[in-house]
């Protein structure tokens, strides 16, 4: 009944209708599914995306429409006029130069770090968030067989387990572990990895091992804390909230990717109201994001640059100008040297970690290959940014520290 309601709500935007699959049809879709006790399955259709690429598309869309976007700039304190926030003192992390940025309205949309910014504005501010760490494992597609995803609605601890084909690999997750504090690069733990392996093996004919995983990664969820102070983060709110401080700083937090536009709408409406700005229609309901295919671009799975949309032509141009850029970053990675150069020139990549984790997803697909690719990426970045060999050495060491922390629980 729930999935039929899902179909009805999707209406014309539905991919296909959900339905029941018998035992044989289920095994045809998921050949490694455990046969004992299997009677059938429910099939439904959903979408997936690359969160890093969507974040870049949103930032570049804003730039296309006149916004100023700065990378590696840290807010150190707010600026005030007559008790109202009117900007921020920020510092360029690379040069150390400080700047004052003035604004009619100030919005704090810093994800898991919103409480740190709120404390800059009001040291007595009550934290809004209870952070949760989610760990995921990545395997070769052959470990599971078939092209379908597997969703288990309720695991041993009452959570959802998923096995999802993604970018030619398979992602398995997730956990939901309460954590104190924040981290730029949270690392998975052996306990979480073993939990995921045990849970997924309960449904597999041929089990996977921890050491079969090509990569492991973790992220922090900005969950809105409940009034009861529950430490069970799976029960905390995934919805977004907006809070306004006494000085007028508008904070938006919580939420999820599927509601990002509504989050932005609510935030801008509140900021405009507080600043006394006149309301005007927003174009974002139908606004094409940067790179949206115009009908002449390839969307084939075999096209290695399909995810770049109309920017695909720039990457092909880089290859024409320098054929060596057609080479992969590593034989086991689906990314080219051209993507690293494009990341620097067009997507504000400044570090090896930027290229291998936040422009491509190499670190999250095959950690060993990403580690091996790091020195070559450092050389490409150094040539683009005018850095010396000492900088390259530091970059590789910094990336190695992150990658080794991710790799440790699966080795």
Task: Outline where the language-model segments fall.
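A conserved short coil-to-beta-strand element within the FAD-binding core of flavoproteins
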Residues: 71-86
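Short beta-strand segments that buttress and anchor functional surface loops
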Residues: 44, 88-92
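Short, surface-exposed charged micro-motifs
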Residues: 77, 102, 160-162, 241
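C-terminal accessory subdomains/tails of enzymes that are appended
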Residues: 1-36, 42-52, 64-65, 80, ...
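Glycine-rich beta-alpha-beta "Rossmann" dinucleotide-binding loop(s) and their flanking helix/strand
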Residues: 62, 116-137
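Core beta-strand elements of the Rossmann-like FAD/NAD(P) dinucleotide-binding domain
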Residues: 94-105
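Aromatic/hydrophobic pocket-lining residues that form π-stacking "cages" and hydrophobic walls in ligand
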Residues: 58
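Short, hydrophobic/aromatic-rich segments at coil-to-beta transitions
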Residues: 84-88, 147-148
């Amino acid at each position: 009944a729930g999935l039929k309601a899902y179909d009805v709500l999707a209406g014309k935007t539905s991919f296909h209708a959900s339905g029941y699959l018998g035992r044989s049809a289920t095994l045809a879709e998921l050949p490694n599914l455990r046969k004992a006790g299997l009677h059938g399955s429910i099939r439904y259709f959903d979408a997936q995306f690359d969160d890093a690429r969507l974040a870049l598309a949103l930032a570049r869309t804003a730039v296309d429409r006149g916004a100023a976007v700065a990378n590696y700039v840290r807010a150190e304190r707010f600026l005030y006029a007559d008790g109202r926030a009117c900007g921020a003192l920020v510092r360029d992390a690379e040069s150390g130069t400080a700047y004052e940025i003035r604004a009619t309205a100030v919005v704090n949309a810093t994800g898991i770090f919103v409480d740190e910014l709120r404390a800059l504005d009001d040291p007595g501010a009550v934290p809004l968030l209870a952070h949760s760490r989610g760990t995921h494992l990545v395997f070769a597609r052959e470990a599971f067989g078939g092209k379908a995803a597997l969703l288990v609605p309720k695991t041993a601890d009452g959570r959802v387990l998923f096995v999802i084909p993604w970018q030619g690999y398979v992602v398995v997750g997730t956990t939901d572990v309460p954590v104190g504090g924040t981290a730029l690069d949270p690392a998975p733990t052996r306990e979480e990895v073993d939990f995921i392996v045990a849970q997924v093996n309960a449904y597999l004919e041929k089990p996977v091992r921890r050491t079969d995983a090509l990569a492991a990664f973790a992220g922090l969820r900005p969950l809105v804390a409940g009034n009861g102070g529950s430490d069970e983060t799976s029960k905390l709110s995934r919805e977004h909230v907006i809070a306004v401080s006494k000085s007028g700083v508008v904070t938006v937090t919580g939420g999820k990717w599927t509601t990002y536009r509504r989050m932005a709408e609510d935030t801008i409406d509140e900021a405009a109201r507080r600043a006394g700005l006149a309301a005007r229609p927003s174009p974002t309901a139908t606004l094409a994001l940067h790179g949206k295919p115009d009908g002449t671009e390839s969307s084939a799975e075999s096209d290695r640059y399909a995810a770049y949309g109309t920017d695909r032509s720039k990457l092909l141009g880089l290859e024409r100008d320098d054929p060596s850029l057609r080479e992969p970053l590593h034989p086991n990675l689906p990314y080219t040297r051209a993507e690293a150069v494009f990341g620097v020139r067009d997507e504000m990549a400044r570090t090896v970690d930027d290229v291998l984790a936040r422009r491509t997803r190499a670190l999250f697909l095959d950690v060993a290959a990403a580690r091996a690719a790091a020195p070559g990426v450092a050389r490409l970045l150094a040539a683009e940014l005018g850095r010396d060999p000492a900088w390259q050495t530091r970059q590789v060491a910094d990336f190695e520290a992150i990658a080794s922390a991710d790799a440790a629980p699966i080795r």
